[in-house]
C-alpha cells in the first residue's frame, strides 16, 4: 500500500478479514493526518483546500524528485477531476480521525526525501515495529520500485 492507502488497507483488511501473505507499506502510515505520525493537519487542510489545477500541479512537483521524474510522470499523469480529488482528501481526513486501525506490516519503505509524508513522522510511527527500508527520492517511489520483484524482496 502506498501513501494514504496504508491507512485504507489497514481499515479494509481488518474489517473484511482478508488473508494476505505479505503486507508492504510505502511512504505512509496508519495515521495519515496526524501532527506526529502523518501529515500535519494544518498542512493537510491547506492541501485539501488548495486542490485546484494549479495546486495539483504544485503537489505533483513536490511528490516527485527532479525534472526527469516530472517528465516521466507527465507521460502517465492521472486524469481525475479536481472536485473528486478534493472530496477524497476531505473524506480521508474525516474518516481517519474516526477509524484508527493498527495491524502488522511485513515491510516498510520510506523515501529519504519525502516532503509529502514527512520522513520523521513516518519513522515516529513505525518505530521498532518493523524494519524500515530507506529509498532514494521523494514521495512517489515507483521509478525506484519499478516492479513487483523489487517491492517484495
Region annotations inferred by a language model:
Residues 14-50, 78, 87-93, 145:
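Flexible "cap/lid" loop of the alpha/beta hydrolase fold
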Residues 9-14, 119:
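Short, hydrophobic alpha-helix immediately C-terminal to the catalytic nucleophile
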Residues 1-9:
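Gly/Ala-rich beta-loop-alpha elbow adjacent to hydrolase catalytic centers
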Residues 102, 107-110, 114:
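Short beta-strand/loop motif that positions the catalytic acidic residue
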Residues 116, 132-152:
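Catalytic histidine-centered segment of alpha/beta-hydrolase-like enzymes
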Residues 52-93:
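Conserved alpha/beta-hydrolase catalytic His-Asp/Glu region
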Residues 104, 117-128, 146-147:
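Short alpha-helix in the alpha/beta-hydrolase fold that links the catalytic acid
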Residues 22-26, 107-109, 133:
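Hydrophobic/aromatic beta-strand patches that form the interior of the parallel beta-sheet core
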Amino acid at each position: 500500500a502506498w501513501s494514504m492507502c496504508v491507512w485504507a488497507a489497514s481499515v479494509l483488511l481488518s474489517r473484511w478479514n482478508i488473508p494476505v501473505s505479505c503486507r508492504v507499506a510505502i511512504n505512509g502510515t496508519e495515521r495519515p493526518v496526524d501532527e506526529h505520525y502523518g501529515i500535519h493537519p494544518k498542512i493537510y487542510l491547506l492541501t485539501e483546500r488548495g486542490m485546484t489545477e494549479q495546486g495539483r500541479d504544485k503537489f505533483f512537483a513536490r511528490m516527485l524528485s527532479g525534472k526527469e521524474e516530472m517528465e516521466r510522470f507527465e507521460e502517465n499523469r492521472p486524469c481525475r477531476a479536481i472536485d473528486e480529488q478534493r472530496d477524497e482528501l476531505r473524506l480521508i481526513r474525516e474518516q481517519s480521525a474516526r477509524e484508527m486501525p493498527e495491524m502488522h506490516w511485513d515491510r516498510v519503505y520510506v523515501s529519504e526525501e519525502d516532503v509529502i509524508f514527512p520522513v520523521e513522522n513516518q519513522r515516529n510511527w513505525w518505530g521498532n515495529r518493523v524494519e524500515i527500508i530507506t529509498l532514494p527520492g521523494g514521495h512517489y517511489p515507483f521509478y525506484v520500485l519499478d516492479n513487483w520483484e523489487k517491492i517484495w524482496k
